């Protein structure tokens, strides 16, 4: 039986150094002439459509108008990202390249993404951090659902369609750096692996009782054993 490993991107695989916030500001200002309360908004663990909707409804823009413009917002974010991601010095988090190399050698592992980023932006961020996005065979993205808790089922379904095998919570692991990643793993009845390589300390993540908790992904052999167990 194959095991599906779904990785978050920002704070888990890469450090984006604020680049995502800049691309969002560019797109919102271009389309709506405002970025809403972006400067004070906590984006951690949220999907792009959730963030966009929160920011724009806060300044009185109707949800229907926002929803109609989401595809255009994603396109503008990706367009701006292609220009600035390399300049922002984005990099892989500690241990990530080594871990992905080892996982790619495992015959019964299917690598995937579960991220709040749109499907257009996600591969651009990975490339800018030196990670090949093509090694991730399936993905569930912010552009698929506003609620992050809906993404595990989407990822599992796409993995099943790709391979012809059944994927559910019993053979799926979700790896992320925020409480939202742990909660969405629980929503999908998947194994929750938390890593304190983002904005949240290990003690904070521990309060949400993930199945496994690491400071970072640097202990390749130990983490490999955990993910494959």
What role is predicted for each listed range?
Residues 1-44, 50-53, 57-58, 202:
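Active-site neighborhood of HAD-like aspartate-dependent phosphohydrolases
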């Amino acid at each position: 039986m194959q095991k599906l490993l779904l990785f978050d991107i920002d704070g888990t695989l890469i450090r984006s150094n604020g680049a995502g916030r800049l691309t969002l500001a560019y797109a919102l200002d271009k389309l709506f002439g405002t970025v809403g309360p972006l400067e004070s908004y906590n984006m951690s663990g949220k999907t792009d459509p959730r963030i966009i909707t929160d920011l724009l409804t806060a300044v009185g823009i109707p949800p229907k108008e926002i929803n109609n413009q989401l595809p255009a917002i994603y396109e503008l974010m990706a367009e701006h990202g292609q220009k600035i991601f390399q300049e922002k010095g984005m990099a892989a988090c500690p241990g990530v390249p080594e871990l992905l190399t080892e996982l790619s050698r495992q015959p019964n592992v299917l690598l995937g993404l579960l991220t709040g980023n749109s499907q257009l932006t996600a591969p651009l961020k990975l490339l800018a951090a030196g990670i090949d996005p093509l090694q991730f065979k399936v993905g569930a993205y912010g552009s698929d659902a506003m609620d992050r808790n809906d993404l595990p089922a989407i990822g599992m379904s796409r993995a099943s369609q790709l391979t012809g095998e059944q994927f559910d919570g019993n053979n799926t692991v979700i790896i992320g750096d925020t409480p939202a990643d742990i909660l969405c793993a629980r929503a999908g009845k998947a194994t929750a692996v938390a890593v304190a390589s983002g904005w949240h300390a290990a003690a904070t993540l521990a309060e949400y009782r993930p199945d496994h908790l690491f400071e970072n992904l640097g202990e390749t052999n130990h983490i490999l054993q955990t993910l494959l167990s």
